């Protein structure tokens, strides 16, 4: 529905294309998580509790490190969770024995959370030298990775906990480059120490989607931070070089169906892959800082060939050889159950936005006990989740 779209979308082409695409601001960060070892295709009966992560030594960290530089560099800095000091010294420690203190958020109103949203939105383009100029896509990736670890069979993982602050989860291959994303959010947390990291990271994902032109995402507060012993095992996030069976294996454990898998894959409208993180290279679309249905249009209408290079298997567009698709992306048009939804979303951005809105809101609440949200029911809009005004909407209202 058109009413779900938000704010102004400023067009700024990423590069010349051989086709007449509607372009929007460009970005360079990878939105998804294709480097963590995961079960192959077809999936095994039981997931591995850990693919490659060994025990790590406790490490002291610098508090409130500045976000900047090589935002997604996969090096030493990415293997350290940068943690700030919350209320009463909470969240000071990093490592396998780290501990956190509870943050009190039930007393805060929608206006308080809107202020947090605004602070995030104001900093999305704070560093024009970072990749293609926006932190938005990497915040979507952070929210995704913090939430997509949920396993409904064991009822573990998910957005409740923000355990990526600690090793070994911070060192999982799928989380390469996200240390700086956490650093970005740490600066926001310093301004609003009352909000839990779990709520902050998911709210950041909401702000990024909306500010980049996507639909309004309903959101509820109530997530609680956890300690390092609650870190999820490696291998719970999708691997980009797999097929449809792997996608179903990963997403079904979270509780998603085929339609929701395709809708959530539409987040690949944003960002790009990097060889020094996932091993893959390039953006999915010509305007990777704009949330649109162009990802699905390209899947359906562009000709894709296997790229000849020294990296892992991926596809490139025939027209310009500047775009890429992963094996998991192509699986969406190779599998009939997935393809029918790709076709729908390619034809109608409104349908895509409506379905993505629901699936993404569901993703951001995975693993959160129902009682956590009940404490906030009196603060919600008539008992309904919050929907936040975009920067453009607030400017137009003044």
From Swiss-Prot:
Q: Where in the cell is it found?
A: Mitochondrion matrix; Mitochondrion intermembrane space
- Cofactor(s) required, per the database record: heme b
- Positions of region (Disordered): 19-53, 217-240
What InterPro entries does the record point to? Ccp1-like, Haem_peroxidase, Haem_peroxidase_sf, Peroxidase_I, Peroxidases_AS, Peroxidases_heam-ligand_BS
Question: Is-annotated flag, keyword Metal-binding?
Answer: yes
Kindly report, in one word, the top-level EC class recorded for this enzyme: oxidoreductase
Which GO cellular component does the record give, naming just one?
Answer: mitochondrial intermembrane space
> How many and how are cofactors bound here?
Binds 1 heme b (iron(II)-protoporphyrin IX) group per subunit.
| UniProtKB keywords | Heme, Iron, Metal-binding, Mitochondrion, Oxidoreductase, Peroxidase, Transit peptide
Using the UniProt record, give the first listed, main subcellular location: mitochondrion
Q: Where is the composition biased (Basic and acidic residues)?
A: 222-240
Q: What is its EC number?
A: 1.11.1.5
- Where are the residues marked Transition state stabilizer as a site? 141
Q: Quote the transit peptide annotation as a residue range.
A: 1-34
In this chain, heme b is annotated as bound at 268
Q: Does the keyword Phosphoprotein apply?
A: no
The name this protein goes by in its record:
Cytochrome c peroxidase, mitochondrial
Give the species.
Mycosarcoma maydis
Organism lineage string: Eukaryota, Fungi, Dikarya, Basidiomycota, Ustilaginomycotina
* Gene behind this protein: CCP1
